[in-house]
Structures are given as C-alpha cells and as structure tokens.
Amino acid sequence: MFQTAWRQEPVTFEDVAVYFTQNEWASLDSVQRALYREVMLENYANVASLAFPFTTPVLVSQLEQGELPWGLDPWEPMGREALRGICPGDEARTEKEGLTPKDHVSKETESFRLMVGGLPGNVSQHLDFGSSLEQPQGHWIIKTKSKRRHFTDTSARHHEAYEVKNGEKFEKLGKNISVSTQLTTNQTNPSGQISYECGQCGRYFIQMADFHRHEKCHTGEKSFECKECGKYFRYNSLLIRHQIIHTGKKPFKCKECGKGLSSDTALIQHQRIHTGEKPYECKECGKAFSSSSVFLQHQRFHTGEKLYECNECWKTFSCSSSFTVHQRMHTGEKPYECKECGKRLSSNTALTQHQRIHTGEKPFECKECGKAFNQKITLIQHQRVHTGEKPYECKVCGKTFSWCGRFILHQKLHTQKTPVQA
C-alpha cells in the first residue's frame, strides 16, 4: 500500500519535477516524451494555481516552446533534490546497496518514472513508461515486465490506458470496446497497446486525450480562453500566467529601474532595454531583436506570409495579436481599463503606453544624447536625427523624410488639385 505524507510548507514545482540528461532523453520514444511533457505542464499548472509567487522554471519554458528539456544534470545537487521522494525508501535502499542514484534508477526500472500529482488532494503516482494501467475497485495496478505495483488512488484520478484483448478488443478502465467499430484509425504498437497515430508527423499516443492535445500543435488550436479579455492559449499554464496581467499584480521587479512586471519572461525582455541585448538575428537582413515573438513576426515580412484575414475588411496580418487588436476596431471592444483615469483601450500594449502618461515613465533612452521617451517608436524616429536616415521617399518628387507623419502630409500636397486660374 502506497501512502503519501503531506508536507506543510508551500509546494514548489521542484517537488513534482523530474529531470533528464541528454542521454536519458535520447533513450525515450515519442510516446514517452509526449507523456512526460503533458505531465510536467499539468504539474506546473497545478502548482501555479496555488498562487505562490515563483519564477517560471526553465524546464516549463523549454517544454512550452517545444525545446529539448535537458541541460540541467539531474544528478547534480539540484537534480537530486528534484528526484528525491520519487519512491519512499528508494534513497535509503540506494545507500544500503552501495549504488549511485543513477545506477539505482536504471536497475530498478527498464525506463523512467514520472511523478503525477504530488499536490494536496492528489496521490503521487509512479508511472513506468511502457506500462499498462488498470483500475479495479479504486486501486491502480501498474504492470511491467518485471513486477506489479499496487497503491490506492484516493482522489479517483482517471488515466486512460489501452491493452489489446484477443486481438480485437481492448480495456479502457475495465470497459470493453470494439476496436473495429470505434477506433478504426488506431494502430497497434510493438508493445501490444492500442495507440493513436498522428497523420501529420507520425507520432504515436496511447491516450486519446494526449493525441487530441498533440493535434492542436499542427492546427494551431488554442482551447484555453481568458474570460477577462477573450484571448486563447494552447496550454493551461500559459493561461494562468496570462491571467496575472488582469489581477494587476507585478511580482517581478527590475533591479535597474524598479519597474514591476507580471512574469519572469516579461522581466527578461524588459531588462534587454537596459542591456541592449538582441539575441535574435534575421539571416535575411541582419536585423536583430530582443524578443523572439517580434523576430518571428519580422521574418514574415521577408516571406510575405500573412496567416490571418479579417472577414470585415479583408485586411491580412502576419501576427495573431495584431489581427486580434484590429478586429476590435470593428467591434468597438476595449477590454483594458486604466485604473488611474478609467479610460479603456483595445490592447494591452496601448494600455501600457497610456499608463506612462500617469507615471511619467520613459524607459527608452537615446544612447547618443541621453534623451528618454515613453514609446519605442518615438525613440526610433528620434535616432534618425543622429543617423540622418530618411527611409520615407516620395515617388512623385523624390524627396525623403525621416518621419512617417511628415511624409504623409507631403504626399497630400501632390494629391490636392491645383486651382484653375481665370
């Protein structure tokens, strides 16, 4: 019988995280990696929902962005802390047998174990990759080639797992379902389990829920909606992080200027204003950017790709956020309200710029003369005074301008009709 002793101190993500080295990650197949990714993001969402202030773990950022989740050696001190408590008695048994933690895990199981839950109200469960699960009478039975483990799931948490029966039927938590009539597109993988194959990339999934979540990566579907502003997100963890914006909480402080930000990602991007760091460089034109999202939007200028089209005016956009803000011009929606004066605005960016009127903040400073501005575009236009750049050229007379506004006013001189002389 597996029992969990709940701790009284606040739960952190490290309490429910498992780390892999590069070699260990390479030994996992696609199904195991997908399961690991879903479990870690779910655990992070559960921890984040407890409202304890903490920085988004590097592991979570890697998983959300589709990066390889390794780089920290789990057998270093931090990794050992994250793995400690995977199974009560494992650490003591390891010392008794004279094995290193790494040797112990490799000998104990044929593959890696994940910790699911670990929070009050859920029982920590150890899932052996490649195992099949059954749930008779409130108990989980984990089948492996070497042993069976039993423990009680007091939270009645359900996980789907499928096992072939007589070549035609499989069990879904004890329910027999015909493969031929209900799951005609499914495949049987080498381990003998029913799996779902992605038609886009060929990946297999044992759980239908995991398969449907994976499909959203190809379709771009975002099923988690913010009730405050209507914005959609692909993962619940991203929604939770976004909702902090509406609460007004800004727990992350910039040490340079003291500005508070709602997320650690926003803090990192903000700090690049002070450092001037621009790690994302365009290979087409050499232009560098401090934000990866802005960099991706810029690349679409070279490719001409515009994925979003407005049904009202048929204008197209290369960026989903610009498309969303544009649609509010037609609907009149202004979901962002200034707490100082009550003015409502159509985008979070417009709200941030507006709030600088009240705070007097001018975060964009010219390195040539030290003059500061409250908008980045104003700084860019100002810098042309020093560089002499005039990117706006009149096709009628060839005159050039450094400011877009002056260029537009000049064009009107050519479009105005000349009065007819008597």
Curated annotation (Swiss-Prot):
Gene Ontology CC terms: nucleus
Q: Could you tell me the Gene Ontology terms of the biological process aspect for this record?
A: regulation of transcription by RNA polymerase II
The record's listing under InterPro entries reads:
KRAB (IPR001909), KRAB_dom_sf (IPR036051), Znf_C2H2_sf (IPR036236), Znf_C2H2_type (IPR013087)
Matching PROSITE patterns = KRAB, ZINC_FINGER_C2H2_1, ZINC_FINGER_C2H2_2
The KRAB domain covers 11-82
Protein localization: Nucleus
| Origin superkingdom | Eukaryota
Q: Mind telling me which SMART domains this protein's record contains?
A: KRAB, ZnF_C2H2
Q: Where are the zinc fingers (C2H2-type)?
A: 196-218, 224-246, 252-274, 280-302, 308-330, 336-358, 364-386, 392-414
The record's similarity note reads: Belongs to the krueppel C2H2-type zinc-finger protein family.
Protein name, UniProt field: Zinc finger protein 620
Species assigned in the record: Homo sapiens (Human)
